[in-house]
Amino acid sequence: MKLNRFGAAVGVLAAGALVLSACGNDDNVTGGGATTGQASAKVDCGGKKTLKASGSTAQANAMTRFVNVFEQACPGQTLNYTANGSGAGISEFNGNQTDFGGSDVPLSKDEAAAAQRRCGSPAWNLPVVFGPIAVTYNLNSVSSLNLDGPTLAKIFNGSITQWNNPAIQALNRDFTLPGERIHVVFRSDESGTTDNFQRYLQAASNGAWGKGAGKSFQGGVGEGARGNDGTSAAAKNTPGSITYNEWSFAQAQHLTMANIVTSAGGDPVAITIDSVGQTIAGATISGVGNDLVLDTDSFYRPKRPGSYPIVLATYEIVCSKYPDSQVGTAVKAFLQSTIGAGQSGLGDNGYIPIPDEFKSRLSTAVNAIA
């Protein structure tokens, strides 16, 4: 596998799309099954030799591992992934430009109808990658910062413009915040990360947000940057800035992350595998059958103290039955390896491994892809 970057590299990424690619062409291959690492997960190799997918930048770093595991499980097969945002991932999948799409939000009603026309069968939303959204900031004098939903909403809609605003200071009584102007950085591209973050602001701000949600940033203030890589780089290089990033990008850029005060009470919550795992454990499925859309409202206003509330699930948007069975076979094999051996080590790279109880439900759906 070869990792290509467009634009100048900063840390893990810089501006532009991340492309995961490997040698080979689009010839079809046949093959038997391979047994890979975690829980001796069965991978039914075969079908299209080189898959193509695009979408969510939040899962870009996880895809690096998933492609490596797929190549090991199914020699001669690979996947090219372009991290160009959830909106592009859905659009390119529905336009039959890719074999599946990655999105941090499930298909809308209209998008699902377009996907069914493209597939000739219902499309499924399969949540495969879980990751917290970090609120990151650049204040040299502040190494630990507490924020809550109402205060974040007022920062990101421009109601609070100074770091020493009384609302922020009240959450951080142990030190005096600087009288520095806040510089908001947001995603300029259509983004599932933005949609999830705005859904959190809407749910957790007690009405302070007032801007709605959606893949485009609605706050009306700040500076836009493309992709998780772009917002990470902008925050790192802008004193007084604040933004939202998928956790793995915040880690890679060594950004300082805020602790979040939640509706469950207790101490402000930092991102850890345990704090996010508690949140995922409370999720329910609102989709029907093998369409595993999650009801994430419980994420944003947790009832259990110690649960980190800003969590996104990245869905792989797939055809339940592909017009070309060779594609369906390969997509199924890729996802089998992803939810099997691909889960090992994710926690070291800013992602949360799929809980065992949910993995069995996901495996049933993946194995049904044709």
From Swiss-Prot:
Topology within the bilayer: Lipid-anchor
Residues annotated to bind phosphate: S56, T57, A58, S86, D104, S191, G192, T193
InterPro entries: ABC_phos-bd_PstS (IPR005673), PBP_domain (IPR024370), Phosphate-bind_PstS (IPR050962)
Gene Ontology cellular-component terms listed: ATP-binding cassette (ABC) transporter complex; extracellular region; peptidoglycan-based cell wall; plasma membrane
Lipidated residues (N-palmitoyl cysteine): C23
Top-level taxon of origin: Bacteria
PROSITE patterns associated with the record: PROKAR_LIPOPROTEIN
Record key words, sorted: Cell membrane, Lipoprotein, Membrane, Palmitate, Phosphate transport, Signal, Stress response, Transport
Coiled coil: none
Summary of subunit composition and partner proteins: Monomer. The complex is composed of two ATP-binding proteins (PstB), two transmembrane proteins (PstC and PstA) and a solute-binding protein (PstS).
UniProt name for this protein: Phosphate-binding protein PstS 3
